[in-house]
């Protein structure tokens, strides 16, 4: 085991206690062999880099600042560790994901609450054009188009616990169209193919299943719930999900049939568009007509102020993607907080309405969102110190997970 920085130097700024340092060092020692490249052990650099990330002030993290905080390592050592060294970040990620899965399973054994795999995207504002996959695109962190990197994340959650277990960097189309730029950033040729965020989410889900990560259901926001390519694939794989949908999503309260209407009269062209024999409703219009006695008040989680309650309504509906010959049956879950200006959430599930109780569907719909907010807080604390290469980006994220 390579000598790590002394505890006195690490703890002098008061960020960590002696006990925390001992536990952190013991934890990272488990990954010792994964940082060995051609007989060179990078564990000291990994340890120092992790400490540098934790010690530097948010939004002021770069390799120069990290060297100031942990002077045992030089700038070029950090740069080489992230961008040049051939340690396998994927192998480290897989180890942490499996350890997280085992921990969440033990939490489930105690609480009885199901484990969710939450898919969500997050943006990280950047300056300049050199960072890998940076572009002017929508940045959720500030609610507008800005210069940023965007990534899709997978998190495991169970009741009060959540942790990030996977990520994939979104590469904009303008980057894919510029092979020279992709090659310069060391993006593998196999990855120089444009993927939408829902496609990236599906890849994360499948890779974690293949790895052996255990979960009971899949959650995500409206970007994923609205994407029928993703939901049809989850149906095909028989993976249970509860995904948010937008308020303008169209639903049928009865199973519709679809056909091209017969031509009426002799004038004009014949109809070519398929139409349903039932009326479709926007979800928010349906919500406005729910009677008071059609809501269930359920207890969902304990807070510092006591138990949190929400109103829940579930109903079987049909949703059509505009392409298939038939509509697919979904359970629509609507939750409403008990406030002067209530917050309303809509979700679709491929589970039958009889498969789960109203309270269980409320858990999937509401509790998971609270944990997503915690996960979002974790992601906003990630720092990206001027990384130009794709392996460096993933290596940086990997050290955050440790």
Predicted regions and their residues:
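Conserved, well-structured functional cores that handle cations and Mg-NTP chemistry
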Residues: 2-218, 225-250, 257-259, 264-281, ...
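Short, solvent-exposed helix-loop connector elements
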Residues: 356-365, 380-397
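Short, catalytically relevant binding-site loops at active-site mouths
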Residues: 225, 248-250, 353-355, 383-385
């Amino acid at each position: 085991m390579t000598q790590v920085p002394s505890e006195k130097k690490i703890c002098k700024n008061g960020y960590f206690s002696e006990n925390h340092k001992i536990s952190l060092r013991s934890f990272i020692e488990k990954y010792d062999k994964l940082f060995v490249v051609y007989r060179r052990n990078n564990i000291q650099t990994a340890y120092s880099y992790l400490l540098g990330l934790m010690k530097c002030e948010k939004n002021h993290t770069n390799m120069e600042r990290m060297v100031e905080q942990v002077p045992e390592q030089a700038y070029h050592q950090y740069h080489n560790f992230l961008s040049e060294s051939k340690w396998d970040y994927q192998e480290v990620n897989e180890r942490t994901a499996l350890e997280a899965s085992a921990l969440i399973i033990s939490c489930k054994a105690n609480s009885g609450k199901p484990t969710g795999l939450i898919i969500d995207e997050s943006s990280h504002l950047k300056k300049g054009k050199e960072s890998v996959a940076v572009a002017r695109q929508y940045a959720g962190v500030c609610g507008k188009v800005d210069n940023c990197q965007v990534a899709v994340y997978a998190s495991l959650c169970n009741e009060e616990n959540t942790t990030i277990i996977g990520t994939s960097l979104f590469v904009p189309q303008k980057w894919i169209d510029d092979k020279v730029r992709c090659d310069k950033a060391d993006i593998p040729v196999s990855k120089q193919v444009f993927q939408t965020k829902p496609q990236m989410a599906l890849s994360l889900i499948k890779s974690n299943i293949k790895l052996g990560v255990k979960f009971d259901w899949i959650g995500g926001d409206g970007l994923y719930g609205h994407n029928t390519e993703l939901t049809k694939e989850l149906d095909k794989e028989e993976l249970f999900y509860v995904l948010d949908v937008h308020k303008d999503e169209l639903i049928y309260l009865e199973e519709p049939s679809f056909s091209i209407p017969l031509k009426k009269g002799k004038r004009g062209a014949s109809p070519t568009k398929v139409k349903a024999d039932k009326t479709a409703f926007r979800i928010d219009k349906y919500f406005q007509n729910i009677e008071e006695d059609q809501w269930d008040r359920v207890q969902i989680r304990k807070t510092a102020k006591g138990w949190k309650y929400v109103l829940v309504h579930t109903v079987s509906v049909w949703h059509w993607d505009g392409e298939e010959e038939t509509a697919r049956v979904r359970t629509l879950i609507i939750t409403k907080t008990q406030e002067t200006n209530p917050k309303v959430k809509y979700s679709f599930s491929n589970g039958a309405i009889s498969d789960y109780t109203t309270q269980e569907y409320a858990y999937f719909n509401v509790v998971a969102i609270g944990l997503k907010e915690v996960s979002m807080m974790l992601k906003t604390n990630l720092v990206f110190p001027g990384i130009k290469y794709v392996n460096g980006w993933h290596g940086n994220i990997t050290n955050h997970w440790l």
